[in-house]
């Protein structure tokens, strides 16, 4: 029987008296990003407010649109859901460490390959780790977002990082785990393609195709879906097909004349996106 990872996470939170919320929108919680890139974005301003105390958890749909042209190469994420657990001056790192191990091993029945942590935290954090785990140091186990930062611990299963705990500001906890990655390790296979899911979520958030910001990302993803011949059915797809056809015709008529020009030139001068034609 396959494990329902999200249901198990909800059960895990309930058993540990941690309030749990299911977020459904990729709209960002501030104007620093086009879409919500992580589960902690809505809580980011609480880490430095020393009078705030408490613990909560969520699952947050996320969309990361860096390197759109590389989507599909197996290494660049697009749309995914992040399981998060956040504690503001309430849980200790040892508490958080015990909790995440319990979720991964007791609820999901996964076997931890190794645990990595920053060299500066070996002396302090190693006593939390059972001798049966392989421990490695990694200087990259340091998270930073502007002036907010923290050392972190990473957990690996089958050579894949499945979860991490950031000791944000030294007195807070930010735990994150990718839902789809955990589902794959638990034998759950989803049929929907990431580009299709991203398009669906952007439209659900009331964005429409346009030349800028969120609308441009939607337009770009629609174009990639058409290029990959993915089954897409929404009110914008025919309009996008027509736009791409016009670009293709213009490019064919002028490529000999301007063939050596860069992709940036074609886009800025004539609105032609070479990747789509």
Enumerate the language-model features and the residues they cover.
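Structured aminoacyl-transfer and RNA-binding surfaces used for tRNA recognition/handling
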Residues: 1-220, 230-235
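Aromatic/basic-lined ligand-recognition segments
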Residues: 225
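Extended, domain-scale alpha-helical bundle/helix-rich regions
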Residues: 241-277
């Amino acid at each position: 029987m396959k494990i329902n990872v999200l249901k198990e996470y909800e059960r895990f939170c309930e058993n540990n008296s941690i309030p749990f919320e299911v977020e459904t929108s990729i709209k960002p919680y501030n104007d620093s990003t086009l879409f919500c890139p992580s589960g902690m974005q809505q809580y980011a301003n609480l880490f430095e407010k020393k009078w705030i105390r408490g613990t909560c958890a969520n699952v947050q749909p996320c969309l990361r649109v860096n390197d759109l042209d590389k989507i599909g190469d197996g290494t660049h994420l697009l749309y995914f859901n992040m399981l998060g657990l956040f504690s503001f001056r309430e849980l200790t790192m040892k508490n958080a460490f015990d909790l995440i191990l319990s979720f991964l091993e007791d609820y999901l029945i996964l076997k931890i390959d190794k645990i990595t942590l920053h060299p500066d935290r070996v002396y302090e954090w190693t006593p939390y780790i059972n001798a049966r785990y392989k421990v490695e140091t990694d200087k990259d186990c340091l998270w930073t977002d502007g002036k907010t930062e923290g050392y972190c611990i990473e957990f690996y299963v089958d050579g894949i990082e499945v979860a991490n705990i950031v000791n944000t500001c030294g007195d807070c906890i930010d735990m994150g785990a990718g839902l789809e990655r955990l589902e794959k390790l638990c034998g759950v296979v989803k049929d929907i393609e990431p580009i299709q899911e991203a398009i669906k979520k952007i439209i659900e958030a009331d964005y429409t195709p346009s030349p800028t910001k969120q609308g441009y990302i939607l337009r770009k993803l629609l174009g990639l879906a058409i290029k990959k011949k993915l089954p897409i059915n929404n009110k914008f797809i025919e309009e996008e097909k027509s736009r791409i056809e016009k670009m293709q015709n213009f490019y064919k008529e002028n490529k000999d004349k301007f063939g050596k020009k860069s992709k940036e030139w074609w886009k800025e001068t004539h609105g032609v996106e070479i990747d789509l034609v």
